Amino acid sequence: MKKIANYLLIEKTDDRYTISMTPELQDDIGTIGYAEFTDNDHLAVDDIILNLEASKTVMSVLSPLAGAVVERNEAATLTPTLLNSEKAEENWIVVLTDVDQAAFDALEDA
């Protein structure tokens, strides 16, 4: 099941929620040249997940859900352009667990 919030895609697989950028956001910000994850192991709604610099903007990516961070796309810190990829296995940002199912269900369907 996929949901969308803040130009981010959230895909639920079992109890894991993978957050990635929508193609619209990727297009709007341009080529990403720098990406830095925050060290938070638990996120609240609107906490910063990732700071990035792209050809069209500098921005912070905010979490659409609260949950525990179990994985970060650390490869994106070495190769930030991975976040521009069309491939889901390359462009993901973080994986969360311990997410409130009702909060996920309340998001817009993708």
From Swiss-Prot:
Task: Cite the Gene3D superfamilies for this sequence.
Answer: 2.40.50.100
Q: Where does the record place the modification N6-lipoyllysine?
A: 56
- Highest taxon of source: Bacteria
**What is a single Pfam family found in this protein's UniProt entry?**
GCV_H
Tell me where in this chain the PTM ADP-ribosyl aspartic acid is found: 27
Q: Where does the Lipoyl-binding domain lie? A: 16-97
What post-translational modification information does the record give?
Is lipoylated on K-56 by LplA2 (SpyM50870) and then mono-ADP-ribosylated on D-27 by SirTM (SpyM50869). The mono-ADP-ribosylation state of GcvH-L might regulate the availability of the lipoyl moiety for redox reactions; ADP-ribosylation would inhibit the interaction of the oxidoreductase with GcvH-L when it is not required, thus ADP-ribosylation of GcvH-L might be acting to keep the response 'off' under non-stress conditions.
Keywords of the record, alphabetical order, are: ADP-ribosylation, Lipoyl
Q: What is the effect of changing residue 28 to A?
A: No effect on ADP-ribosylation
Q: What is the effect of changing residue 47 to A?
A: No effect on ADP-ribosylation
Q: Which SUPFAM superfamilies match?
A: Single hybrid motif
**Statement: the UniProt record of this protein carries the keyword Glycoprotein:** no
Tell me, how does this one assemble?
Lipoylated GcvH-L directly interacts with SpyM50868, which reverses the SirTM-mediated mono-ADP-ribosylation of GcvH-L, and with the oxidoreductase SpyM50865.
> What role does it play?
May act as a carrier protein for the ROS scavenging lipoyl moiety and/or as a substrate for oxidoreductases such as SpyM50865 and SpyM50866.
According to UniProt, the name of this protein is Glycine cleavage system H-like protein
